[in-house]
Amino acid sequence: MDIQELTDRMNDLVRSKGWYDEDSKRPQTPRNLAISLALEAAEILEHFQFREKAKDTEQLAGELADVALYLLQLASITGIDLEKAILDKIEVNKKREWDQE
């Protein structure tokens, strides 16, 4: 399955819940999705608080999936081709030099 197929499935779910409706109590705006993305990313950190390895990889997988879904949705509603953006960023990073510590 590719990024577009995942995005389509995510959009189907959001539509089926009515979250794209104008009167939705969960308006799917770029701002709200960015906030949700950050909150879900913070939940990933909880799995590593005071430990080097996640204590429950199944729960961690769910949090990673939440982050990915919000990222796909944010890219979708802002008209960003996430696959292209990722490939472009990889090319930029190939040429980038990071400080060696």
What are the residue ranges of the model-derived segments?
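Flexible "arm" and connector segments at domain edges
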Residues: 1-64, 68-101
